[in-house]
Amino acid sequence: MSLVYGLVVNGPAYGSQASRKAFQFAEAVLAQGHSIKKVFFYQEGVLNASSLILPANDEVDITKQWQELALRHDIELETCVAAALRRGVIGEEEASQHQLKQHNLAVGFQQAGLGGLATALLKFDRVVQF
């Protein structure tokens, strides 16, 4: 039986194992034939969606890995808009709305509210938080 998963990532790209563990879990779930419809980045997890993250050459680029996984498996990558704005991760729409000249939301990520997550939770067989 194939299950539909949703993931919630609360840890930043670096300085915590949460994002890396979530990514490894996602790969394992997909390899077993299940699907993941959404990865929601919340609290410090929104930092995974910054296009300004530049890891050293010998480090894993977790943001790029999330982007590639999402493309390969049609997974939505969403950040909590309030948490993201609070931490300086700004999408193009929010930059325009707040009259900012720059935005730094990485390609493939979208910003959404917690209401969107709550609605999506009803569609998943399993939700795993990291």
Curated annotation (Swiss-Prot):
Keywords for the protein's UniProt record, in alphabetical order? Cytoplasm, Transferase
| Record-linked Pfam families | DsrE (PF02635)
Q: Which SUPFAM superfamilies match?
A: DsrEFH-like
Q: Which GO terms describe its biological process?
A: tRNA wobble position uridine thiolation
Segments passing through the bilayer: none
Q: Which InterPro entries match?
A: DsrEFH-like, Sulphur_relay_DsrE/F-like, Sulphur_relay_TusD/DsrE
The catalytic residues are 80
Give one GO term, molecular function aspect. sulfurtransferase activity
CC per GO annotation: sulfurtransferase complex
Q: What is its EC number?
A: 2.8.1.-
The region annotated as signal peptide is: none
Localization in the cell: Cytoplasm
Protein task: Could be part of a sulfur-relay system.
PANTHER family annotated for this entry?
PROTEIN YCHN, SULFURTRANSFERASE TUSD
State the similarity comment. Answer: Belongs to the DsrE/TusD family.
Q: What is this protein called?
A: Sulfurtransferase TusD homolog
